């Protein structure tokens, strides 16, 4: 492929992906899910001069417990820092739209990197020029239109950005590894430094960057050939017995340690900040995340996750929990949203996973999937693997299109076709995924409109009821949405008994509780019983603008407000 053709192909893929993501972003008018609001809200606070601050205290597992509080006790800051750049230019009036600029650009770049990965795989498989070109461009086109990649290219969180960094790191790993076996005496330090920069920036985006680093370590230590061109008897004997000569060991150490040092150096300032702010250089509640027994444990206040509570479930419950986490990551993240490409890609992955061009991505994908499924089986059901799975979906696209290309070539030989029809594979894939993409974007657009309508109507309704927002922090089941829409301090509602919530309210001086009736949480239904402290929650009826009761069409019909009043 000529340089001109490569630039034209990359430009065409980027343009297609950009248009699709811009349309999707325009359809989403409010940050959903809540973590999206967190990233965009912190970016707004940075632009307004408040620094890395959040008005929502959504987790009680990291000290100090204050509200507003320093942001990113669990997540990483880079998505917010980048979102602050267009926000600083455009202003904070349209803070969410400004934040979407970064996600649209990052999501479009994912498609270009997918094209490059497909082209590398095609070159390694030694496909004819026409089929190779089709596989590369087809991979980029499918990545431009695949529902999950489109959706998270419209939402300013960590997903699209981490996918860009993961794919870039894996592409660079394959190039460094290929040079190790090409006869060159040493890999230039600039490539190793660049890899370290990518790993460090990825670590500032998501904690799953560690699995990228381990994938590179595995490639360096076990996957690289001994230095090409060394045909001495000593080298041949060492190669037969799996022994690394001293010079080889030194080179492998350099390949591993230079990127690791650069990545650690880039992460060091953030680690120091966390140490000074939260008392730990790394996310302090990671261990507790592994001990969750319920999706609501992230909001636990008095009943914190513990090893004793985790083991007390018994073997059957633990097996069921891990099966649920595995099933969520497999079905809800990889197969169903990307159907049928996700399913086909998984089935044919053994056909391509030995390709050196895909090896780093395969290793990182397997490590990420295994750790999130086995160690964080409950936390992953809230998005741990999902937000790190962008690059994994690209891997499945390449595997699926490579299999379709082989199938079409085989059918062509059997049917004696004379015209090239490799384009049928990407065409079939696009025809299959576009309807689901439209449905996915439409669904999240409706959700965003519903959530925005609810939080736009809530302040006026509470003012009419005589309990205006702003008098101290508010306890609520969606603390980030309320904090960012009403610009007030909020506290996450623990899924615990009323007396525990009373302790929380007394500690922070909260006088109001706002909760949605969703049939999933025990709140507010728990107040209908005789639980200790239930009588301290006095419901405040909400009315419409005319003073009448809320009808079924009101965005607040499922919203309940309580005044916390206890002697």
Annotate each PLM feature.
Residues 221, 320-369, 403-406:
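Hydrophobic, aromatic-rich transmembrane alpha-helices
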Residues 98-128, 168:
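Transmembrane-helix motifs of polytopic, lipid-linked glycan transferases
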Residues 18, 139-144, 191-206, 213-218, ...:
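Membrane-interface alpha helices of multi-pass inner-membrane proteins
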Residues 11-18, 137, 143, 199, ...:
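Transmembrane alpha-helix segments characteristic
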Residues 70-85, 89-112, 137, 152, ...:
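Loop-to-helix entry region of an early transmembrane alpha helix in multi-pass inner-membrane enzymes
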Residues 420-481, 489, 494, 498, ...:
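Membrane-embedded, lumen/periplasm-facing catalytic core of multi-pass transferases
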Residues 11, 133-137, 197, 213, ...:
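Signature aromatic-anchored transmembrane alpha helix within multi-pass, membrane-resident enzymes
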Residues 34, 98-106, 138-173, 201-213, ...:
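Multi-pass, polyprenyl lipid-linked donor-dependent membrane glycosyltransferases
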């Amino acid at each position: 492929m000529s340089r001109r053709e490569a630039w034209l192909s990359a430009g065409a893929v980027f343009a297609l992906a950009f248009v699709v993501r811009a349309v999707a972003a325009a359809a989403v008018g409010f940050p959903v899910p809540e973590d999206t609001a967190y990233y965009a809200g912190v970016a707004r606070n940075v632009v307004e001069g408040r620094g890395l601050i959040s008005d929502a205290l959504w987790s009680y597992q990291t000290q100090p417990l204050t509200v507003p509080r320093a942001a990113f006790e669990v997540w990483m800051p880079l998505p917010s820092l980048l979102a602050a750049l267009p926000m600083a230019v455009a202003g904070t009036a349209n803070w969410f739209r400004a934040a979407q600029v970064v996600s649209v650009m990052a999501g479009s770049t994912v498609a270009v990197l997918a094209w490059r990965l497909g082209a590398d795989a095609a070159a390694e498989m030694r496909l004819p020029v026409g089929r190779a070109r089709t596989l590369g461009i087809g991979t980029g086109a499918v990545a431009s239109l695949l529902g999950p990649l489109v959706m998270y290219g419209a939402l300013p969180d960590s997903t699209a950005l981490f996918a860009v960094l993961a794919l870039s790191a894996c592409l660079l790993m394959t190039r460094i590894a290929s040079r190790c076996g090409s006869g060159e005496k040493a890999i230039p330090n600039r490539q190793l430094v660049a890899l370290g920069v990518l790993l460090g920036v990825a670590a500032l985006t998501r904690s799953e960057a560690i699995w990228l680093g381990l994938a590179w370590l595995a490639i360096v230590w076990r996957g690289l050939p001994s230095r090409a061109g060394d045909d001495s008897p000593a080298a041949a004997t060492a190669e037969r017995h799996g022994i690394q000569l001293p010079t080889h060991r030194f080179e492998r150490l350099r390949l591993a340690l230079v990127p690791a040092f650069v990545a650690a150096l880039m992460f060091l300032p953030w680690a120091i900040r966390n140490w000074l702010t939260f008392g730990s250089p790394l996310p302090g509640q990671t261990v507790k995340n592994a001990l969750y027994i319920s999706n609501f444990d992230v909001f636990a206040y008095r009943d914190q996750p513990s090893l004793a509570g985790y083991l007390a479930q018994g073997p059957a419950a633990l097996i069921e929990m891990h099966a649920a986490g595995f099933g969520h990551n497999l079905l809800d993240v990889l197969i169903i949203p990307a159907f049928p490409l996700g399913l086909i890609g998984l089935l044919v992955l053994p056909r391509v996973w030995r390709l050196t061009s895909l090896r780093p991505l395969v290793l990182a994908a397997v490590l990420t999937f295994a750790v999130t499924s086995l160690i964080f089986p409950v936390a992953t059901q809230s998005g741990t693997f999902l937000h790190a799975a962008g690059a994994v979906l690209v891997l499945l696209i390449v595997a699926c299109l490579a299999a379709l290309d082989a199938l079409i070539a085989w059918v062509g030989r059997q049917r004696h076709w004379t015209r090239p029809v490799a384009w049928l594979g990407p065409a079939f894939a696009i025809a299959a995924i576009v309807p689901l993409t439209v449905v996915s974007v439409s669904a999240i657009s409706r959700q965003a409109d519903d959530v925005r309508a609810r939080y736009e109507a809530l302040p006026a309704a509470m003012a009419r009821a005589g309990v205006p927002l702003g008098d101290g922090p508010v306890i609520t089941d969606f603390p980030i949405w309320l904090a960012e829409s009403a610009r007030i301090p909020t506290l996450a509602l623990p899924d615990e008994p009323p007396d525990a919530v009373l302790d929380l309210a007394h500690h922070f001086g909260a006088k109001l509780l706002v909760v949605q009736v969703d049939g999933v949480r025990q709140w507010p239904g728990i107040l209908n019983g005789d639980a200790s402290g239930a009588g301290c929650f006095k419901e405040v009826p909400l009315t419409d603008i005319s003073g009448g009761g809320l009808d079924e069409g009101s965005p607040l019909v499922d919203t309940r407000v309580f005044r916390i009043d206890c002697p």
